[in-house]
Amino acid sequence: MKKILLLTFLSFLLISCGSSKSSSSSKTTKVERTSKSNSYKKTESIISYAKTFKGTRYKFGGTTKKGMDCSGLVYTSFLKEKISLPRVSRDMAKKGKRLSKDKISKGDLVFFKTNKNKNVINHVGLVVESKRGNILFIHSSSSRGVIVSSLDEKYWRNAFVEGRRVL
């Protein structure tokens, strides 16, 4: 029995932050359309708030400074601007406008498939900078907590699925 529990626990750690607290199906998701100047202000505010979590340890299902998973970071950061997104990365990937890599800009979301055994989006990051094709995003890594990474890093380049614009 202990071996089964240990294997189950290790499995959860290995799948990064792909799933977490399920969002209620009775809740509606509100993605707000805004003017360009208002959108810019909201984008800056969301990114600024997300950066306050840098260094926060990874915690499956976490949404606070005590621990944060990838979708929790994005969910909490957007909620600061009263923008409600689904709580799970694979559901977030259904919102907004799909973007090719060359159209991704600051404030967009980037989605990944990091579990080689499952063909499902299980990781999300928030783009904090996009200059000359170099895309930097903040996310919560299961091994390093909340950090900023580059889409040019081999691991993330290979796991990348799509970008989405929700603002």
Q: Which residues fall in each region the model found?
A:
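Extracytoplasmic/secreted envelope proteins and their assembly/folding machinery
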Residues: 43-51, 71-75, 104, 160
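Aromatic- and glycine-rich peptidoglycan recognition patches
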Residues: 18-27, 33-38, 127-167
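Short, Lys/Arg- and Gly-enriched loop/turn segments at beta-strand edges
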Residues: 117-124
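Sec-dependent signal peptide recognition
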Residues: 2-8, 21
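C-terminal motif of bacterial Sec signal peptides marking the signal peptidase cleavage site
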Residues: 13-16
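Catalytic cysteine-centered active-site loop
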Residues: 34-37, 57-106
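Short strand-connecting beta-turns/loops that link adjacent beta-strands
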Residues: 104, 117, 131-133
